[in-house]
Swiss-Prot record:
It is found in: Cell projection, Cilium; Cytoplasm, Cytoskeleton, Cilium basal body; Cell projection, Cilium, Photoreceptor outer segment; Cell projection, Cilium, Flagellum. As component of the IFT complex A (IFT-A), a complex required for retrograde ciliary transport and entry into cilia of G protein-coupled receptors (GPCRs), it is involved in cilia function and/or assembly. Essential for functional IFT-A assembly and ciliary entry of GPCRs. Associates with the BBSome complex to mediate ciliary transport. Induction: By androgenic hormones. Expression increased 3-fold in an androgen-stimulated androgen-sensitive prostate adenocarcinoma cell line compared with androgen-deprived cells. The lineage of its organism: Eukaryota, Metazoa, Chordata, Craniata, Vertebrata. The keyword Oxidoreductase does not apply. It comes from the Eukaryota. It is linked to Cranioectodermal dysplasia 4: A disorder primarily characterized by craniofacial, skeletal and ectodermal abnormalities. Clinical features include craniosynostosis, narrow rib cage, short limbs, brachydactyly, hypoplastic and widely spaced teeth, sparse hair, skin laxity and abnormal nails. Nephronophthisis leading to progressive renal failure, hepatic fibrosis, heart defects, and retinitis pigmentosa have also been described. The keyword Membrane does not apply. Its main location: other. The gene is WDR19. This is WD repeat-containing protein 19. It comes from Homo sapiens. Pfam families: Beta-prop_WDR19_1st, Beta-prop_WDR19_2nd, TPR_IF140-IFT172, Zf_2nd_IFT121, Zf_IFT144_1st.
Amino acid sequence: MKRIFSLLEKTWLGAPIQFAWQKTSGNYLAVTGADYIVKIFDRHGQKRSEINLPGNCVAMDWDKDGDVLAVIAEKSSCIYLWDANTNKTSQLDNGMRDQMSFLLWSKVGSFLAVGTVKGNLLIYNHQTSRKIPVLGKHTKRITCGCWNAENLLALGGEDKMITVSNQEGDTIRQTQVRSEPSNMQFFLMKMDDRTSAAESMISVVLGKKTLFFLNLNEPDNPADLEFQQDFGNIVCYNWYGDGRIMIGFSCGHFVVISTHTGELGQEIFQARNHKDNLTSIAVSQTLNKVATCGDNCIKIQDLVDLKDMYVILNLDEENKGLGTLSWTDDGQLLALSTQRGSLHVFLTKLPILGDACSTRIAYLTSLLEVTVANPVEGELPITVSVDVEPNFVAVGLYHLAVGMNNRAWFYVLGENAVKKLKDMEYLGTVASICLHSDYAAALFEGKVQLHLIESEILDAQEERETRLFPAVDDKCRILCHALTSDFLIYGTDTGVVQYFYIEDWQFVNDYRHPVSVKKIFPDPNGTRLVFIDEKSDGFVYCPVNDATYEIPDFSPTIKGVLWENWPMDKGVFIAYDDDKVYTYVFHKDTIQGAKVILAGSTKVPFAHKPLLLYNGELTCQTQSGKVNNIYLSTHGFLSNLKDTGPDELRPMLAQNLMLKRFSDAWEMCRILNDEAAWNELARACLHHMEVEFAIRVYRRIGNVGIVMSLEQIKGIEDYNLLAGHLAMFTNDYNLAQDLYLASSCPIAALEMRRDLQHWDSALQLAKHLAPDQIPFISKEYAIQLEFAGDYVNALAHYEKGITGDNKEHDEACLAGVAQMSIRMGDIRRGVNQALKHPSRVLKRDCGAILENMKQFSEAAQLYEKGLYYDKAASVYIRSKNWAKVGDLLPHVSSPKIHLQYAKAKEADGRYKEAVVAYENAKQWQSVIRIYLDHLNNPEKAVNIVRETQSLDGAKMVARFFLQLGDYGSAIQFLVMSKCNNEAFTLAQQHNKMEIYADIIGSEDTTNEDYQSIALYFEGEKRYLQAGKFFLLCGQYSRALKHFLKCPSSEDNVAIEMAIETVGQAKDELLTNQLIDHLLGENDGMPKDAKYLFRLYMALKQYREAAQTAIIIAREEQSAGNYRNAHDVLFSMYAELKSQKIKIPSEMATNLMILHSYILVKIHVKNGDHMKGARMLIRVANNISKFPSHIVPILTSTVIECHRAGLKNSAFSFAAMLMRPEYRSKIDAKYKKKIEGMVRRPDISEIEEATTPCPFCKFLLPECELLCPGCKNSIPYCIATGRHMLKDDWTVCPHCDFPALYSELKIMLNTESTCPMCSERLNAAQLKKISDCTQYLRTEEEL
């Protein structure tokens, strides 16, 4: 909303003012204040007239058409009438001496009702000038009233009476009310069925508190509504919509109630629109909006949804409060009076007038203001003030035109300013105008006038200055027109579209349509045109080839069309109506020819008129005088694609393909990375004949075959031939054939049909295009017919296919003749043909046909002739010709035939021949049976059973051995034949259960079989075997019980089996039983701790296993078995590490000390005494962990330290050896030397080298493993025992323990295994690690 003017007359200040809009047109506004003058302004705030009054204005009103303004004033008995058409004022004497108090024009007639302070009434007919005075209508002042559509007049007065009179002044009804009435209105009452009745209901405010309803049809049954006291007084109310009342209260409340029967007074909406006060309500049915004012602001809401606040206008300068609101009937202007005596007029709805030329737009931004802008090129908008409210606007490259009726004003558009050029009158009322760079074309009354805009500047020839279309002799009316850079184009009521070429000043093209052309819309270049005919059908017309293309799904409500101005989308245009925009694309070059497609539709906001389309962005003009940009739904891909998912991208890809934006589609396919999307893009390229782009796409997805095909055709210039190839690639073969036949190479149609094996079509084409190809096509067609079972036609085509000069082809045809002859029943001809034919395959195929026809003799003859011995023998068997079968048997490979032959020989009692035939037939059961029953050769039968694993054969052999009393062999073969129950019973009866158990343990056996064996051994008190089979059948509790019962001779095996049982069972009760047994709780004899360790490992209880491992290692260490202790700790360390369980510090420390001890031997052996000495010092400092070898270790430490030059360390450990408990145990070989070291001490010492901590780079001794700087335990090198260095890191590829890369390489020169895990290792397997971060995790991180 925009304030267009304010009226601030000095004489009005300090008092409220009255005002009234001219009805219908709203061109005038009558305003009066305390100055005894009614001033009449136009809609732009210019004063047009005034009426001088003898006193203050009492009331004023416009008649229904807005032609006459009636005014009454104090101190006067005259009614003042101002005529809007003549701008003259007349006076009418009321004929009564009373002071007038009320005035109102009728809604439908020219009746004026005037009431007086004494209750008298005057009805004046302005049309006939008849006056009807009615005395005593009321006893006191008439204060309010209203007319209805039937010219009934309702009046209210200070006498608390409501009267209803007709236009003659006769009283029809009168009703007494309890308070003084005000604001009286007639309205339509809604009945139960919601149908409208006549205006028979009167609503009136009583005492400013109550809303009273009087039904003229039921005057004795009035209704009233009272409201909450805190709402204040009723200020005003308005009827709207379907029987609803909108009521404003002085305290700012705003209420909507229903008046439907049964709903009277039901509240629909309530809001406190204004905090302190509300002074007025105004409803615009045209805009469907309501305005309220108060608290120095105006609020406008939508009647459809009152919660929707359309706009809020603040008037901070009006500090004395606001007055009354009023709309013009068209809803275009809203006037507001104020308590201080000012009046403001706001523009609420503008006529949507606008035009576009290329990317420049011009649109109405106020009643007398046009804005010219170029949003695409970023030019600053230029505002042009115009002299009149325009009915039309046009913009060109350099000019702007506005106008109304038959007159137009032209302006020159400069860079930053606009200059008025001239105005021009036309011969009729202008419907529309179009601008060219030099010319303007105006359409009026069925004609178009083309004229120069600046004729004096161009120095043009006189005949080229102006021209009127159509010519005098042309009896048509022009209905629409357009100007492009080169042409004037217009459409007529006779259906002609004319192109007038401005440069040559002559017509160059015309198109005749069957019905009249209502609207035309050329594209920016004028090479294409959309027109709409009187049937509301849309077409695209191309003047270049004079072709039209119907626009599909074209809505009959379409108001206009805009072409895309973005140069890359030349064929895109939109058609719009009030609700939607439809995006169309004109595809000029497709394999199906030129066509128009509907790409999609976009919902347009209310009252938006499209002005410009650029790259999918639609610039629309709104009622508020602004422009709003919306993106078409068909161009959703122009938004950011980064966060778009595949489900949203696929519809966008389809949009791109419809719009022929292949580069954008390529990017989407790249993001989707989906072969289906790439194929869709490729097919679209083929459809649009974009061969190069299609090659690029198919190359991207690796479709080599089609890339090669497209490369071969891309240079073809014949449009139809190229389109035919592409149609074929897209599987549209009928289209491809039509295109090929229309091209310069029609034979391509025949080649395509042959490739597709469409032989019927190929034969039809060959008759005209290549008669010499008919035999070859006939043969192929015959093959297809044969396959379909049409043997008659197949035979005919085979016969047609014989050429006589093409041997290979003729042989194929003769083979077909032979087969079809047999199928048709001409067996002799077919067989003779097949026997003469050189093909073996033909003989086989004909033999098969004959065999199906039960012609066995001929079939076998052909099979044998064709060397198909299996088939021949089979047919001979069917005909019981065993002699022939026997002759063919050496050549037969089919087991089935051998079996049939074997059965025949067995029946004849020829067992040796039968057994050979059975073997050839792989019928081992029969072979075994014959060896056992007839040939008495059990050895051969047993060998065959073992080789073939025949179940039935094994049963037969088992029965055979059972008869011989060989129970072990019988059990073996019973198990082999899956007869486990029989084998078990036999083993039980003959005490052969061990054999049965051994055999069944290696078989795929059921739990029931294992349980049977376990129960047998349990009965025999063979606990180990019983436990083993209980374990196999999953009965863990019973298995454990038996293992624990085993005698001590089987103790080791039994405990191992018990551990396996508990590991599988994962049962806490069983686990505790076994632990108690291992700890000696049952028999007082604890078992070796290694079993407890294995138990915990089996249960995957790695922490408990670790504790046990530490105990075992400690025992091994105490016993002097240091390598065993090291290996136990290492294996546990590796297991815990693989399970990602934290390593106990005691385990890690013990492993490090033991490993240091092991390293001593390696370094001393290699002659590196310093490294050996340093490790011995570490071991000697933990000497309590080596109780079995304290003296030897200390002795070695003293010797190695002395050798390495660590004299002070040697002295310290020598002094320790001199203690009484150790002195006597020193080896005599070293005793004197050590005593000498103690007596003559040398405390010189080579200082230990320092190296940086890998965590914090603090320098510390190289054998120190705890950093004083960061307090971290540093990993140690498994080759030297020193702490690790960040830049010299490697790990053993087997155990993953770290080592100094340089030192481990040196060690591997003499050693072949890892010092930690003892796995084989060489220097080539080592890799230096540049980033050792993963090995430097602190304990907190772990």
